Amino acid sequence: MINKYIYLVFILLIYSVIAEGQNTVCFDIEPNPNSSDPAFSEFTKYINVFGIGIYAEDGVSNEKVKHVAAIFAEWLDNNEDSIVDNSLVLNELLSRGALMPVFEDEGSPAEISFFENYDGDGVSAVCYEFEIITYRPLVNEFDATIEENLHTISSLGYANAYPSAFSEEENSNSLLTLAMDLARGGHFTSIPNPYPPEAWYHYDDYTCDYEC
């Protein structure tokens, strides 16, 4: 019986070390390098991830800013060897000035200033403070950081590096869009109500367009 308890304690210790290692973030928050640009003037926090800027306003905690940066980095460097796994994707992101804005809330000063003044092509998604979950999500929770970072990387990176496979344009006939149309039971530019019986993928976010 004692041996079983020792074994259990050992397993729990190993698990705690692994969990702690997965949550370790090695990024430092820097001052906003583009504070003189009207579009970025309300951001006070910045992290450089392989040349891609993570910009956050003051109301977003340092922990959450670092979490967004860590997830972005892991999408690009999954084995965490500090080398981007796909240089073509990174080059497409950099050529478009890809970035990830992190706003405290919808309609915040930073969001208003950003979208009133930004005229680039580097934004495909944004993060909001209330959507970011830095701990292990519960059953009814989802860390939107994962999805929003992937939107940016897929839309600006993969879709341009490999258009025949990953283009998100509705008439591109890419492998991605053909697979999605098959899963949804047809080609729909708006959400069908209801989905056809043969559909096995039912996406119902009315804030999204076909590409989303």
Where are the regions that the model predicts?
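Sec-dependent N-terminal signal peptides
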Residues: Y5-Y15
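Catalytic-loop region of hydrolases
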Residues: D28-A39, N62
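Boundary at the C-terminal end of the N-terminal hydrophobic targeting segment
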Residues: A19-G21
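A eukaryotic "domain-start" boundary segment
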Residues: N23-C26, E30-N32, K45
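Extracellular low-complexity, Gly/Ser/Thr-rich intrinsically disordered linkers
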Residues: A199-C212
